[in-house]
């Protein structure tokens, strides 16, 4: 039992374990809230960087940040049943109905831009082109092998048929990114900041305000904006239809976006990360999990025309009230292109 391991390593007696956001085991003491977070995927260097980021944000008086607790032996992590975990401490969560996700994220990024230390292992700034290129090359090589080795499962057939379309979209995203870096100049607000691996609807909400360092990377702020918008459009369509780009408006009331930021954001929306993640996850998953990814692929393939319209609408919105065309249009989007 993890209770016994934590008693041994930290001297903390756990009365009851529960779950935080269906993701992390957690427990409370009279004055504090603790999260038990798996960290086997991180190198020691990356964990150290995440530790210093959390300490920095705590020093900046971020009320929601969780911080690493050292074991009695002075270690940042502990082992349990062959896996590595960290114990994070936060203020007890409470609901905040006045919470504005856009404004709150802008303030979080503002603080993160002041982070004074170099970030290497957890750094992603300036790396999108290379990371996307590697992802494309790997899936393209896999796709070619699949084409040449029938018979195919239904998922294989859908992947084989759809990949050329998403390859084209991916190449457009990389070209858009390259053109942005050539044509535009970053401003002060375009410097690196503390971001999230995936900023989604449930990452922060009025009911879940805790900032979790294991979720973080150091990158350009547009990463979080794009991923939040993508996730909302794909998985919370009703909210998106009602609120539109309110999230982006709230963000810009705190930190207006430069043309460079807007173009980076748009290039990231263009890159079909959701397609790559579903296909990669399917082939890495157990048999019991495959049905979920089959359904997800069907959903995004049936939805690709609406996603193109979303991209066009996002481009138009980011150019509103601008004196010049900040975010160039991708001419073929929304022209009835097929998979």
Curated annotation (Swiss-Prot):
Compartments, record wording: Forespore outer membrane; Spore coat
Keywords on record: Membrane, Sporulation
Membrane listed as a keyword: yes
Highest taxon, organism lineage: Bacteria
Membrane topology recorded in Swiss-Prot or TrEMBL: Peripheral membrane protein
Keyword Isomerase: no
SUPFAM superfamilies, per the entry: Protein kinase-like (PK-like)
GO cellular component labels: endospore-forming forespore; membrane
Chief location of this protein within or outside the cell: membrane
InterPro entries per the UniProt record, alphabetical: CotS-like, Kinase-like_dom_sf, Spore_coat_YutH
GO BP: any one term: sporulation resulting in formation of a cellular spore
Family: Belongs to the CotS family.
Function (record text): Involved in sporulation.
Name of protein: Endospore coat-associated protein YutH
Organism: Bacillus subtilis (strain 168)
């Amino acid at each position: 039992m993890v209770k016994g391991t934590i008693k041994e390593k930290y001297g903390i007696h756990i009365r009851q374990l529960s779950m935080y956001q269906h993701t992390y085991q957690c427990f409370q003491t009279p004055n504090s809230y603790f999260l038990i977070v798996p960290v086997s995927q991180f190198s020691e260097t990356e964990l150290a960087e995440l530790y210093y980021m959390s300490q920095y944000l705590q020093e900046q008086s971020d009320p929601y940040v969780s911080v690493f607790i050292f074991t009695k032996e002075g270690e940042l992590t502990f082992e349990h049943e062959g896996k590595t975990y960290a114990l994070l401490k936060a203020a007890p969560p409470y609901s905040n109905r006045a919470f504005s996700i856009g404004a709150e994220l802008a303030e979080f990024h503002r603080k993160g831009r002041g982070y004074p230390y170099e970030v290497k292992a957890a750094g992603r700034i300036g790396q999108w082109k290379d990371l996307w290129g590697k992802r494309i090359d790997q899936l393209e090589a896999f796709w070619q092998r699949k084409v040449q080795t029938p018979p195919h499962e239904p998922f294989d057939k859908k992947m084989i048929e759809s990949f050329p379309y998403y390859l084209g979209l991916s190449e457009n995203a990389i070209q858009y990114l390259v053109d942005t870096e050539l044509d535009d100049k970053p401003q002060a607000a375009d410097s690196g900041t503390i971001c999230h691996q995936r900023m989604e609807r449930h990452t922060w909400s009025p009911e879940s305000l805790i900032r979790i360092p294991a979720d973080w990377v150091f990158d350009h702020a547009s990463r979080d904006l794009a991923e939040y918008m993508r996730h909302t459009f794909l998985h919370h369509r009703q909210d998106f239809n009602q609120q539109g780009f309110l999230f982006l408006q709230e963000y810009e009331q705190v930190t207006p976006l430069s043309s460079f930021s807007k173009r980076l954001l748009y290039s990231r929306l263009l890159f079909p990360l959701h397609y790559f993640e579903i296909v990669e996850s399917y082939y890495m998953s157990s048999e019991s999990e495959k049905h979920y990814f089959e359904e997800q692929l069907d959903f995004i393939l049936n939805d690709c025309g609406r996603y193109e319209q979303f991209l066009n609408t996002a481009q138009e919105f980011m150019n509103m009230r601008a004196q010049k065309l900040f975010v160039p249009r991708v001419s073929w989007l929304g022209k009835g292109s097929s998979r």
